[in-house]
């Protein structure tokens, strides 16, 4: 099964944002260059050509789109390359993040894992956790949203206060930050201290695409989610 074609994850919003290929030797997704702005079909062709490979083993496209016509367009682009339905998935942001988070070491999610997606005005927080019912394991999500007045000049202070309040009410083994509202080089004063108080903290703008790549891998090998049901917001299509 190790030689059945490339395992690819793509982040898409009307055009390709970024893409990853799963490195079987390293056991991690590896970023693909020069695919931003392409269609899904063109990005896949470029990736296959770069790796000198003819076949897709598994593909996952993370989409923020919910319109059925746009989702059908994604499927049409994939189908135009001769990729079978059982070879690809289309996932939403939180679904992709779940694949990323639960592909990490257990110590990073055993007490819950939190995603903070901040666009500079609205912060969406999702907490994922295991739950068991009737002998079946589930991953469930809880969502909060908070609007920060960016015109007041107090946005950083309000952000730190809200995050501090959130973690006074919620436990987590780790927290992941993403979105254009977070500066990966410098977080607001006081925020780092709040984030790492009793948990691990990570920041990056590639969480969703890496999660999509892990999802594509999982679609073949079932290492993590074989006996787990994923019940999170934004589940779009899993073949």
Regions found by a protein language model. Give the residues of each.
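Gly/Thr-rich phosphate-binding beta-strand-loop-beta motif of the actin/hexokinase/Hsp70
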Residues: 1-30, 102-142
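Conserved phosphate-binding loops in N-terminal lobes of ATP-dependent enzymes
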Residues: 2-75, 79, 143-160, 165-172
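Active-site neighborhood for divalent-cation/phosphate handling
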Residues: 57-104, 205
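Glycine-rich phosphate-binding loops at beta-strand->alpha-helix junctions
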Residues: 59-70, 163-194, 200, 204-205
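A short acidic (Asp/Glu
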Residues: 69-74, 100-102, 123-128, 183-190
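Conserved phosphate-binding/catalytic loops in two-lobed NTP-binding clefts
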Residues: 83-96, 189-213
């Amino acid at each position: 099964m190790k030689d059945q074609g490339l395992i690819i994850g793509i982040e898409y919003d009307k055009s390709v944002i970024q893409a990853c290929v799963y490195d079987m030797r390293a056991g991690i997704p590896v970023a693909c260059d020069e695919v931003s702005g392409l269609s899904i079909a063109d990005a896949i062709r470029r990736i296959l050509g770069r790796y000198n490979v003819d076949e897709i083993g598994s593909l996952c496209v993370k989409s923020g789109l919910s319109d059925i016509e746009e989702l059908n367009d994604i499927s049409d682009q994939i189908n135009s390359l001769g990729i079978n339905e059982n070879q690809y998935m289309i996932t939403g942001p939180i679904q992709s993040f779940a694949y990323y988070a639960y592909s990490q070491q257990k110590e990073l999610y055993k007490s819950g894992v939190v995603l903070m997606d901040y666009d500079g005005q609205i912060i969406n927080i999702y907490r994922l956790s295991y739950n068991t019912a009737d002998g079946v394991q589930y991953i469930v999500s809880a969502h909060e949203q908070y609007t920060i007045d960016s015109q007041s000049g107090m946005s950083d202070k309000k952000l730190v206060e809200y995050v501090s309040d959130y973690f006074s009410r919620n436990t987590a083994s780790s927290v992941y930050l993403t979105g254009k509202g977070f500066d990966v080089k410098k977080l607001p004063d006081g925020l780092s201290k709040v984030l790492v108080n009793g948990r691990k903290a990570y920041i990056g703008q590639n969480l969703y695409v890496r999660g999509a790549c892990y999802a594509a891998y999982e679609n073949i090998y079932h290492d993590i989610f074989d006996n787990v049901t994923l019940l999170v917001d934004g589940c779009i299509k899993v073949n």
